[in-house]
A protein has these predicted regions:
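Short, low-complexity N-terminal intrinsically disordered segments enriched in polar/charged residues
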Residues: 19-45
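Positively charged n-region of N-terminal signal peptides that target proteins for export
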Residues: 1-4
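Bacterial N-terminal signal peptides
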Residues: 7-16
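Surface-exposed, charged secondary-structure patches
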Residues: 22, 73-133
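A short gly/proline-enriched turn/hairpin at secondary-structure junctions
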Residues: 60-71
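Short, well-ordered alpha-helical segments enriched in acidic and aromatic residues
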Residues: 47-62
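Compositionally biased, proline/threonine/alanine/serine-rich low-complexity intrinsically disordered stretches
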Residues: 21-26, 76-80, 174-182
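Low-complexity, intrinsically disordered terminal/linker segments enriched in charged
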Residues: 127-137, 141-182
Length: 182
């Protein structure tokens, strides 16, 4: 009886452990590098459509369910909101640290395999006459062959990410930092 109890406890504790982080494979790293480059260019050039296109479809579905909007209408609204924000904010010196990215591998309840990485980003923003240096973690997720990106720089954003990707619930992520500049 003790053996069965111990085996059950061991199995439960192993299931509770997060998947081991691993370095990205060469092909994965190249694909992620291209996707990050396209995403950063979209931000730098004020391409709201490109920014929204990079959002994970599962997150868009959650927003759609919460708002009652169909995906096309929701994406149109998100592009308009992002465009309005980008028109009042200048972003420069945008960079992502790709030097030491460790990936996690997870399988969702529907059988979808997801590779995820936290990408440190830094940029300078100017809005309303104020300039700030921003350091933000960016969640990169690969489902199938496509990489998608989601900011996770606050509790609400992390909660939305965990709704779409339950394996993220309870994970600790680097905090965003904003430093005013003169």
């Amino acid at each position: 009886m003790r053996t069965i109890w111990f085996a059950a406890l061991l199995a439960a504790s192993l299931l509770a452990l997060p998947a081991a982080a691993r370095p990205l494979g060469k092909a994965e790293a190249r694909a992620l590098d291209r996707a990050i480059g396209a995403y950063l260019r979209a931000i730098e050039t004020g391409d709201a459509q490109g920014v929204i296109a990079a959002m994970p479809p599962r997150v868009v579905s959650i927003f759609g369910a919460a708002t009652g909007l169909e995906e096309k209408a929701l994406r149109t609204m998100l592009v308009a909101q992002t465009d309005a924000l980008m028109r009042t904010t200048t972003v420069r010196n945008l960079a992502a640290d790709r030097s030491a990215l460790d990936a996690g591998d997870e399988t969702l309840a529907d059988g979808t395999t997801v590779v995820w990485v936290i990408v440190p980003t830094v940029f300078v923003s100017e809005a309303g006459g104020k300039t700030a240096r921003n350091e933000q973690p960016l969640l990169a997720l690969r489902e199938g062959k496509a990489w998608h990106f989601l900011r996770i720089d606050g509790r609400e954003r992390r909660e939305v990410a965990a709704l779409a990707y339950p394996f993220l619930a309870g994970k600790t992520f680097p905090e965003a930092r904003t430093t005013p500049l003169q």
